[in-house]
Amino acid sequence: MPMRSYSTVQKLLHWSVAALVAFNLLLPDGMNAWHRLVKHGQVPQPADISAANIHALVGIAILFLVAVRLAIRITSGVPPQPNGQPPIIHRLAGLVHGLLYALLFAMPISGMMAYYMGIDVAGTLHAEVLKTALWLLLGAHVAGALAQHFYFKSDVLRRMTVS
């Protein structure tokens, strides 16, 4: 019998990753300030280093939690797509989920390459290209969940929240 809802662990991982991603996307100032100082040859103060470390450690936590989440997804599975929808909707959902997983690995890895290894191109990729792509995919993910709930009247949103 296919699962009808995500497990409690899957839900906790989903919303923990969502909260950490929101934190790093909405509050990147510590890393940005540290980067500006280093770029201009200035010495970061301990508070600057601490703020940058918080951003980096949140990114590492995201990487770890996404790896655990993906392992659980592979071993335990996920609820099936709702019936009665156009096949393109299922393909789009799969594409967005796959790209989100890829970005949630690429963002922390590129950030670590920039911060800990000093690889400038990784920093540019991280802060400009991947960050923009992540915002777009997050928008698509939220829009898709809302469309499932309000337009298609499916249980997709409920099974990641209350069910």
Language-model segments: what does each one mean?
Residues 1-163:
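Membrane-embedded alpha-helical bundles that constitute the cytochrome b-like, heme-associated redox core
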